[in-house]
């Protein structure tokens, strides 16, 4: 018996949170995204129990797309899932094209050198000092463009290699932007795409609250994206599309080669 979830509902696991599917969201033409095909999540290494492994296997996954860096994946490797093909394509990259590594050691290295250099380069481009939040928002706005991870994701969708699970470490940033792009491609509204994006703060509420508990109140909004997501950052990423293109359809045609015929075929397959 297939279990049907309401749009954005969390799929419960003992060891992980923020695991859900994209089924149920309504597109502009009145159809809804099909259930049981498009899954999003975080670190699968957190699924330790037999019950969690059985639950994951029950999804019948054909593809797992890991959006993490090599360092993150090596530190917390995905478990083998029967019948699922695994590939890894990092979802965030530095200006020079190298992977942005959010593993423990990677973050330490980034803090010391790479992130500082990236931020300084951004400040030179805008001609003034910027706050970390503004700089990271700028990184977010670049994520939908020329991103090999999202090209791999849409190739799986067009190839109908589903059910597919795409995930990163927390299921919020690289995964969240990817999920919004899928929903927009299927004709779901910007508002509903952002609703799905912001649900991370619901399913990671306890983690976020623990992290922010000892932080100054004036800094909590700025620090929220460390463990949660920021609506201005998520909105900024997809609104940047309309700043560069006259429509989402024009973006999908130029970025992924999804002309009108291919976009219609994608929607006909994933909507009902």
Feature names for model-found ranges:
Residues 170, 174-175:
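Ser/Thr-glycine-rich phosphate-binding loops at phosphate-binding pockets of nucleotides
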Residues 1-165, 177-272:
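Cys-dependent protein tyrosine phosphatase-like superfamily
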């Amino acid at each position: 018996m297939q279990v049907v979830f309401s749009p954005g509902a969390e799929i419960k696991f003992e060891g992980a949170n923020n695991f859900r599917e994209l089924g149920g969201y309504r597109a502009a033409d009145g159809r809804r995204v099909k259930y049981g095909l498009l899954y999003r999540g975080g670190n699968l290494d957190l699924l330790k129990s037999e019950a969690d492994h059985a639950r994951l296997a029950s999804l019948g996954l054909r593809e797992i797309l890991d959006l993490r860096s090599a360092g993150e994946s090596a530190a917390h490797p995905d478990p083998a899932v029967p019948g699922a093909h695994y590939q890894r394509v990092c979802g965030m990259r530095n200006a020079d094209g190298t992977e942005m590594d959010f593993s423990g050691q990677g973050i330490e290295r980034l803090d010391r050198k790479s992130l500082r250099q990236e931020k300084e380069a951004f400040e030179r481009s805008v001609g003034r000092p910027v706050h970390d939040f503004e700089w990271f928002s700028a990184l977010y706005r670049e994520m939908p463009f020329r991103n090999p991870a999202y090209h791999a994701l849409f190739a799986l969708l067009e190839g109908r290699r589903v059910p597919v699970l795409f995930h990163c470490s927390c299921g919020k940033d690289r995964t969240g932007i990817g999920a919004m792009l899928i929903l927009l491609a299927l004709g779901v509204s910007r508002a509903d795409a952002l609703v799905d994006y912001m649900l991370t703060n619901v399913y990671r509420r306890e983690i976020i609250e623990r992290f922010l508990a000892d932080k100054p109140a004036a800094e909590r909004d700025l620090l929220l994206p460390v463990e949660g997501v920021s609506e201005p950052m998520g909105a900024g990423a997809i609104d940047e599309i309309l700043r560069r293109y006259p429509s989402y359809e024009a973006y999908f045609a130029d970025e992924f080669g999804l002309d009108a015929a291919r976009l219609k075929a994608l929607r006909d397959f994933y909507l009902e």
